[in-house]
Amino acid sequence: VIRVEDYLTSVISSEMSATASLELLKAHAVISRSWLLANLSGLQTDKLQLPVGNDTMRNKNANQDNTANCQLSTADCQLKWYERDSHTHFDVCADDHCQRYQGITRASTDIVRQAIAATRGQVLISEGKICDARFSKCCGGAFEEFQYCWEDIKYPYLAKQRDYLTGNKKTAPELPDLTQESEADRWIRTSPEAFCNTTNKKILSQVLNNYDQETTDFYRWKVEYTQDELSALILKRSGIDYGQIIDLVPVARGTSGRLWKL
């Protein structure tokens, strides 16, 4: 058992640099506290509506006792998602599935403790409820909406947005319609201006620990798999043997261009 504020002291030191600026650490403390308390308070409980009907069944490879970490089969679709119930013996885990937590012995600084103390008890609120404040170190240039990443729930505070200056179409064009394949293809294959599209070491040292800075292609990258490797990977992730994968066809994308149906 650990107190919330002690937990957060480690989280903001583990997720980002413990030597970041005070205001950045304070903002992260509020965001991380909001995510934690939203989940601990059970705001995620019983929201998931499982499909029903004669053409729907729970996949035989799914965990039968866990509705929040399961897999469903329909006549033409496989749906799999993961949530916090993938660990049932503790509230949150120590890695990116929840929040990076490297223990209370994690090296901290006076400025981290100051940020926690200055924001003690502060959370983000929307419509009277604590916000399920999801975050990432690099968004790829556009924020994604909650319903395309986790569950089919639309939160007004997790809306699509270009990660750049807004209001001036010359210096900050509007976010393209990345649900359209042609626009998404162009967006992904180029490197649009964005706050997180930077190689500035001073900026990166504010938000990344030293070991995270070893990665340099975090904004755009390329990974290649052989057909056998891809088939094995999908079998491992889904528990279903589809045989040899002949093609991967994009079917639906979220507002950031990320695939949610393939």
Question: How does the language model describe each region?
Answer:
Residues V1-L262:
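Conserved, single-site charged/polar hotspot
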